[in-house]
Amino acid sequence: MPYNFTTIEKKWQQYWLEHKSFRALEPREAGDAPKSYVLDMFPYPSGAGLHVGHPEGYTATDIVSRYLRMRGHNVLHPMGWDAFGLPAEQYAIKTNTHPRATTEQNIANFRRQIQMLGLSYDWDREIDTTDPEYYKWTQWIFLQLFNSYFDPNDQKAQPISRLINELQNENLVVGPDGSVRTNPNAEGLDEIAGDVRVERLWRELKPDEQQDVIAGQRLAYTDEVAVNWCPGLGTVLANEEVIDGKSEVGGFPVERRPMRQWMLRITAYADRLLSDLDALEWPEPLKEMQRNWIGRSEGAHVDFEIIPPDEHVRQTDANRGETIDDGEDDDLSITVFTTRPDTLYGATYMVLAPEHPLVDRITPSAHRETIEAYRTQCAARSERDRMAESKEKTGVFTGANAINPVNDEKIPIYIADYVLMGYGTGAIMAVPAHDERDFEFARKFNLPIRAVVMPDEAWLRAESPSPNFDALALSTGYLEDAGNFKKAFTGSGVAINSPAIEGLATAEAKRRIIDKLEEDGAGHRAITYKLRDWLFSRQRYWGEPFPILLDSEGNAYPVSEAELPIALPEMTDFKPTGTPQPPLSKATEWVNILREGRQFSRETNTMPQWAGSCWYYLRFIDPHNKQRFVDPVKEQYWMPVDLYVGGAEHAVLHLLYSRFWHKVLFDLGHVSTPEPFRRLVNQGIILGESEYHTVEETPRKVTEAEVEKKGSGYVLGSNPSIRVESQSFKMSKARGNVVSPDDIVKDYGADTFRLYEMYMGPLEAQKPWNTRDIVGMSRFLNAVWRHLIGDEEAPVGGTLRVIDGPIPEALDRQMNRTIKKVGEDIAGLRFNTAIAELIKLNNEMGKLASIPRPLAENFTLMLAPLAPHIAEEIWQRLGHERSLARQAWPAFDESKLAESTIELPVQVNGKVRDKITVPVDADEASILRTASAAPGVQQWVHGKSVKKQIYVLGKLVNLVVN
């Protein structure tokens, strides 16, 4: 009869909780045991609970953690909840409940589901990012950022007090743009720029100017930035949260508008974030995603002088509070960054981002109405929508022109939505012959397309409208009219139509043209990054409050660390105001603060959901410490995380933000490692069950029961002439393909569920769920139970099928090979092949009348990380009083790893007629005798003459007969 998995699993889950079986030892308790920190990306506890895809990574880390404990490691394997965020707040508003209440309910459900799966977490370390005792330290880390700056000389964060001392001591000076730089000549500062003083000393600045300088250097600062504002949600959204001009949550309209936001200066760490990737044991595609997000580019900044319009612009810019008078714009220029300065001679127009501040200053009145209409249109679109490759190019001529610095050619200036203010300088030189977007734009607006790099013949022939021309005709045609070709040539080649660099290969042409720009004062070498500073504030209630006070001028002051945590006020009305004023602004008693006779207000924005997840791995190390965010001795013992497992959807932002915070904490001496996560693995997505559609003029959905397999595909059972396609999709409530682990565990048990998820395929692979396949793992576990226990009535402490006796030699060898292979596979996260080895060994065990105790115990120990409940029960029934959670992993005998026998196919005249099993050290003569006597061979050689006997060593025997 089947074993009673429900009773057994509840019994052992309760045992593990009561006995704290998986408690990680503190450093002082661990002795010489090696440490292993195994971490999951902790979940956001949604109201829907877990579906079967979520536990895949949790099960993988659980198996590794259990295996490492059995190998004598001190394992830290914790779990917690990333519980702040917009979805919780939206649900609370929708249901008229407080987000804290719904969050607590969701956490309780997630905890129940996770414990139901037998995951070996140290529950004494459970954390919740919405707990004031947790976000007290999130606020503390923010203060470290606020009170620090990035020293470009040391390439690290330093206390802001150090910067002030350097300025007061006049080792540093302040540039005209507010930047801080080394004082090149403290004694002769007046001579730095002749008679004109360029830099200023600290003592020469007014107090408000000094405050502005320091604010401009902090790692946490405020700035007026263009954001995706969603009035319906009452908050700013990231680009990833906006689709076709609407919010991903709720589908509300989104508009671009400037707003005061908190920013974190992650760009200062771009080089370190990039270079330190090389030493990490992460998947290469994931590292490449981070490299691309950081986007380091080498090239040049080039200055294009603007030709003053015939009619000067007269306007007052309300945002800047300044008036533009006649003549003021005579020396304006536009700076662009380009990675291809060698194509400068091919720049035939310029494009500014619609938000570029120069647009107002260079646009004459005749063009202003058109420009403003286009800018309004662009403001309704997210950056992601604007950058979509497939969309048609749009733009408007400003009425102004610029001078190309290498050939003095007059070129028009446009604005277009495919240029973004946040990338580079917010302006580009357009080289349509050698950039695809510029090429499409130039074709649409009938702008010149001038080739300045010659492609190879293969490209010319592939993209020419006349591919049958000879090589000379192709190159001549390209020189004369590159716009007639199918697309832009974006590769390297030889410079053409470029007097200063004619005939040079691309690399040398770049170097020469930059030299020329620097000689002419028209540009210089530069390195830029796609990475932008991190927009760190949200206009919502359910998030960490900033530990910041604002005076009447809007200047920011940190609260003292003794005041932390700044707790969220209790509010019954936390709905968004529909304006940029966040919900917290309605808590007037909480907002307004009187300090030393001065009136202050609390910052009413809250931190983004990323904040709590940036450092949670550190709090797990020391979750109950009220004096420090982590004890330094414990941090030094446990860090870095040895194995971090989570979804690829967090490949960029979460990991990049965590690495940034960690590096700041490292620079300031709060942590001991420069990187947080040594090894990272992304589990593959488990898709919903396969869906079937007919392939016909009007496709229709059909059930699996209506489908038949035909060759490598499917057909409709009732009409085999109609082909059927199978496809799997990501699980979602909207699609109706969500499978709950509660249902699977109820019907099959947690151990069967765990084994099935791990047996579906490689951990990193994407794979479809199929409930019908689970029965295979259920049969396996029931077979294990029958082979070792016999039936459910076996008494505790005794067994029906286990004996004290030796293991048969062949099975002993297989057992030793299995111990080695399963251990290696678990360490390498190859769980599907580990399970396959156990299935094979169990099949051989089933051939025995009774199971020798050493085989039974070793098999149970190997099964334990994968199916822990049934393994614990069998272990106890084998007579052991203590849990096997910390039993030693079985050792294998090296001398027994080799096979004692080999199986050889026997051919007669080249066709296999039988197989024989012979000792691995048998000589050729005995092998040939055995082969000739095999029953399957005898019927083919009887009465015939064997002309030749062939033995291919270790491979086969072939008998050649008349």
Outline where the language-model segments fall:
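N-terminal catalytic cores of NTP/NDP-binding nucleotidyl/phosphoryl-transfer enzymes
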Residues: 26-103, 127-138, 338-339, 405-441, ...
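Catalytic alpha/beta core of large soluble enzyme barrels
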Residues: 61-62, 74, 356-454, 483, ...
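Conserved oxyanion/phosphate-binding beta-strand-loop segments in alpha/beta enzyme cores
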Residues: 1-39, 69-78, 102-108, 282, ...
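Helix-rich, typically C-terminal accessory recognition domains appended to large enzymatic cores
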Residues: 82, 153-159, 216, 220-228, ...
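Residue patterns forming the tRNA-binding/recognition surfaces of aminoacyl-tRNA synthetases
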Residues: 2, 15-19, 94-333, 427-563, ...
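Flexible, glycine/threonine-enriched loop-and-boundary segments that flank and lead into catalytic domains
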Residues: 285-335, 380-409, 413, 534, ...
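Long, charged, mostly alpha-helical binding arms that flank functional sites
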Residues: 3, 86, 97, 101, ...
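Basic, alpha-helical terminal appendages of large translation-related enzymes
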Residues: 1-33, 353-356, 365-368, 448-457, ...
